[in-house]
Amino acid sequence: MWQAVRFTACSDDDDIKAPNEIDTSVMSGDYKGKMTSWNIAAHEGEGENGEAEPGVDVSATIENRTVRFEKFPIKDIVLSIVKDENLANQIVEAVGDVNYDIEYVPVLTAAKDSIMMNLNPEPLKLTVTMPAETEGGEAQSLVVEVQVAAGEKKAGYAIENGNLKFYIDVTKVMLGEGEDRQEFTGFVPASLHFDMNQCRISHN
C-alpha cells in the first residue's frame, strides 16, 4: 500500500499520485511564500540585531521548467542603487509590476521524495525613471541590467509537502546601454532566498 502525497493549501485528491507515478511535472502550479535578502558579505539571513529578516510576500508559477514571477520584488535592488528609502519607493511605484522568469533543469532523486533544480537565471532588465533633481526639471530614464546567478545552496522541491526553496545571487548592476554602459561600483552583491509553498497543481 502506498502513502498519499500531501500538498499544501488548495490541492485535492485528484492531484495525488502514487510514488511510482511521481515525476518532475508535480512541480507545476502556483506558489506563495516569502523572499528574504541579505548582503553576501554579511551574516546570512540575519539583520543588524541578529534576528532573521521578515522578508516580503512573493508569488510565482512553475510551468514548462520555468519559475515565472509576475511581480518580482525589486525594492531591495533599487534601494541598493539609490541609497534612499523614499526615492526607492517612488521608483518601484513608477516601474510597476516586473515580470521575471528563471529557467531550470529538474532532477528527480532516486528516492522520489524531492526534485533538485539546476537554475539558469538570466539578467533582470529594468527601465527606471529617475525623478528630476530640481523643480521643473526633466525626469531621466535609466536602463538597469542586474546580473543574476544561481546561489551556492541547492535549490529543490519537496514532494511530500510541496515546499519550494531556492537561492539566486544578485552579483552586479550595469547602468546605461551601448557605449555609455558601465558598472555601478557602489552596489553590494546580495543573495535572495525564496521559500514558497505550492497552493495549486497544474496538470500538464
List each language-model region with its residue ranges.
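Short, solvent-exposed loop/hinge segments that bridge or flank secondary-structure elements
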Residues: G33-D84, F187
